[in-house]
């Protein structure tokens, strides 16, 4: 009997345990739990000794300075890594798509960001954050399924709804038209078998759930949708690079995995942008993992080898070294 379970094992025992997420809105809020996850990752999943390998960590855009220092400190002092580096998630996704200039819409479980990147560097003044992501969509799906008479409340049941979301939801190209289709026929209905064998049917919920990304008012939020947020990010950039951003709009993260999302983004941004502008939305099939893939690319570059923060540099300068070496 262990005092804590991590990852898939925590999920499989979720009925008898309390499930906790140490990362909120993309930023680590519980360092003790985060340390447990890292420990589990090194020793149980990767089965590598962290003191024998350099470690590349990723962070949310606009991650607080104290957080970057804390990550650095834990890696060197708790795990004794010989070297480490912290890279911004969206930048790695862009690398994974084979680009160094573009705008990344990165949407995961807790937060979404639009990050304009020029020649490999994120432009901090133009980064926008949207506290609307996968977990909010799961909660919203729980809510609208309740209206249909299906109740999901516990942390275990939330995970079932997350699975329904991942398997059956999609983004409509034209929301009003899709609602009309759903009302007049059963062509959009799908059934889903719950773990206890009960079968539920869902219809317009399939596209109403991710529609909240484009219409946050569905969640009672007074904020711009992902399309407008991306547009606003582009408009905060120098006029000379906007053309490159419009033509290289890259989707990344699990919450961009809904079928139909790229076509809808194309349509919405085309409506916002200048009329002659070439707009291209890039949605790589592996975008759920593109941050990891980009990290793998970065860490294997010969030019990157002098970028690592070494244990020696850390011992000389302390955690603040991260701001001088990782930007």
UniProtKB/Swiss-Prot annotation:
Catalytic reaction(s) noted: ATP + H2O = ADP + phosphate + H(+)
UniProt keyword list: ATP-binding, Cytoplasm, Cytoskeleton, Hydrolase, Nucleotide-binding
GO molecular function, one term: ATP binding
Cellular compartments per GO CC: cytoplasm; cytoskeleton
EC number, as in UniProt: 3.6.4.-
Chief location bin: cytoplasm
Localization per record: Cytoplasm, Cytoskeleton
Ranges in a coiled coil: none
Entry superkingdom: Eukaryota
Role this protein plays: Actins are highly conserved proteins that are involved in various types of cell motility and are ubiquitously expressed in all eukaryotic cells.
Family: Belongs to the actin family.
Further comment: There are at least 4 actin isoforms expressed during artemia development.
Descriptive protein name: Actin, clone 302
Organism of this sequence: Artemia sp. (Brine shrimp)
Species lineage: Eukaryota, Metazoa, Ecdysozoa, Arthropoda, Crustacea
């Amino acid at each position: 009997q262990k005092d804590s379970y991590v990852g898939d094992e925590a999920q499989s025992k979720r009925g008898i345990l309390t499930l906790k997420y140490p990362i909120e809105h993309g930023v680590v809020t519980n360092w003790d739990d985060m340390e447990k996850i890292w420990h589990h990752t090194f020793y149980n999943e990767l089965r590598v000794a962290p003191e024998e390998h350099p470690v590349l960590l990723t962070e949310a855009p606009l991650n607080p300075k104290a957080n970057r220092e804390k990550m650095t400190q834990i890696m060197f002092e708790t795990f004794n890594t010989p070297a480490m580096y912290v890279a911004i998630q969206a930048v790695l996704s862009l690398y994974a798509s084979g680009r160094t200039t573009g705008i990344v819409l990165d949407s995961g479980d807790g937060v979404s960001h639009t990050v304009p990147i020029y020649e490999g560097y994120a432009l901090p003044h133009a980064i926008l954050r949207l506290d609307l992501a996968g977990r909010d969509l799961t909660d919203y799906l729980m809510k609208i399924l309740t209206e249909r008479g299906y109740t999901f409340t516990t942390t275990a049941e939330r995970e079932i709804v997350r699975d329904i979301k991942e398997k059956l939801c999609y983004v409509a190209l034209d929301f009003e038209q899709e609602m009309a289709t759903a009302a007049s026929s059963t062509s959009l209905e799908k059934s889903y078998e719950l773990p206890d064998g009960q079968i539920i049917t869902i219809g317009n919920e399939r596209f109403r759930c991710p529609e909240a990304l484009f219409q946050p008012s569905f969640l009672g939020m007074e904020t711009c949708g992902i399309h407008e947020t991306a547009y606003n990010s582009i408009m905060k950039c120098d006029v000379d690079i906007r053309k490159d951003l419009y033509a290289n709009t890259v989707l990344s993260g699990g919450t961009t995995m809904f079928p139909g999302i790229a076509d809808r983004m194309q349509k919405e941004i085309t409506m916002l942008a200048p009329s002659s502008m070439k707009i291209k939305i890039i949605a790589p099939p592996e975008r759920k993992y593109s941050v990891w893939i980009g990290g793998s690319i970065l860490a294997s570059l010969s030019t990157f080898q002098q970028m690592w923060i070494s244990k020696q540099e850390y011992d000389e300068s302390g955690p603040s070294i991260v701001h001088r070496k990782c930007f």
